[in-house]
């Protein structure tokens, strides 16, 4: 029989103190993240239903699998960005957080370019990893090339998500996803009603979603002075000036050579 002192059921089901400010922050952030996830999944469901109406459900699933594989690979940079930004902001070091985010974005976009090139060059063979049906593989080839071209943009978006999650900017992420998802759903709806539409049209609709996410996150990152990572160029310059410097004694090589020549024994 378990000791009641070890497991206190009353404490498990006790309501939290309403005066706790951290609880409100937790609930608000969690709600925003839930809304963001629901909006994104709504777009993905809409894309799948549109592909099914066009008779390309199998090829669409192949493309989605390629999407998820690249996403999880590139998302590793986003996880690093999230941790670095959170650590810097925890020390009230906004310029340091911004510099870490800039570096993560650079690495993310570079990795996206590399992955995009590999996916684009293997677009005809890649579907056969997921299917042995030649017709489905042929249907998936062109959308996979679109996916390949999107990789640098996708990576920037994933890192941007990580950066703003690290800065606890959850409310903005939900609003940005609402705008982007709205554009994506409109594009997918138009694709489903377009005469002669194909799976390529569906993935152009997915591209609309990603362009919307990139635009909203980019505005927040580069333009919005209310962003938690907003810094002026002067603040960045001061940050670099405050970095520990290394004193280096520079030697005039030409003067030293001349002196050595004049003092050399004849």
Mark where each language-model region is.
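Alpha-helical transmembrane segments of multi-pass membrane proteins
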Residues: 24, 63-70, 134-160, 182, ...
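Helix-terminus/linker motif at the lipid-water interface of multi-pass membrane proteins
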Residues: 14, 34, 38-69, 87-88, ...
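Small-residue-rich hydrophobic transmembrane alpha-helices
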Residues: 57-123, 155-168, 172-173
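Residue-level hotspots within pore-lining transmembrane alpha-helices
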Residues: 31, 35-39, 43, 51, ...
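Short runs within selected transmembrane alpha-helices of multi-pass transporters and secretion channels
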Residues: 1, 74-78, 147-166, 172-184, ...
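Alpha-helical transmembrane segments of multipass membrane proteins
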Residues: 45-49, 69, 117, 125, ...
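Residues that mark transmembrane-helix kinks and helix-interface sites
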Residues: 41, 45, 79-80, 140, ...
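Short alpha-helical transmembrane segments in multi-pass integral membrane proteins
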Residues: 1-34, 85-150, 190-266
């Amino acid at each position: 029989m378990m000791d009641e002192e070890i497991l206190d059921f009353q404490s498990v089901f006790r309501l939290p103190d309403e005066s706790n400010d951290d609880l409100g922050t937790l609930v608000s952030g969690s709600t925003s993240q839930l809304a963001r996830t629901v909006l994104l999944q709504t777009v993905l469901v809409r894309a799948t239903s549109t592909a099914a109406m066009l008779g390309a459900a199998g090829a669409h699933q192949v493309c989605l699998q390629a999407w998820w594989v690249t996403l999880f690979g590139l998302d590793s940079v986003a996880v690093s960005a999230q941790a670095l930004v959170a650590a810097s902001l925890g020390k009230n070091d906004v310029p340091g957080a911004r510099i870490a985010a800039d570096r993560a974005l650079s690495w993310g976009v570079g990795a996206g370019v590399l992955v995009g090139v590999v996916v684009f060059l293997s677009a005809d063979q890649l579907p056969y990893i997921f299917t042995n049906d030649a017709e489905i593989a042929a249907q998936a080839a062109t959308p996979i090339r679109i996916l390949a071209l999107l990789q640098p943009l996708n990576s920037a978006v994933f890192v941007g998500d990580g950066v703003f999650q690290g800065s606890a900017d959850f409310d903005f992420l939900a609003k940005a996803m609402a705008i982007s998802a709205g554009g994506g759903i409109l594009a997918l709806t138009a694709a489903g009603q377009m005469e002669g539409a194909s799976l390529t049209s569906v993935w152009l609709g997915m591209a609309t979603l990603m362009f919307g996410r990139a635009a909203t996150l980019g505005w927040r990152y580069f333009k919005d002075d209310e962003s938690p990572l907003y810094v002026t160029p002067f603040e960045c310059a001061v940050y670099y000036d405050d970095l520990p410097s290394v004193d280096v004694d520079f030697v005039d090589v030409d003067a030293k050579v001349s002196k050595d020549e004049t003092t050399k024994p004849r």
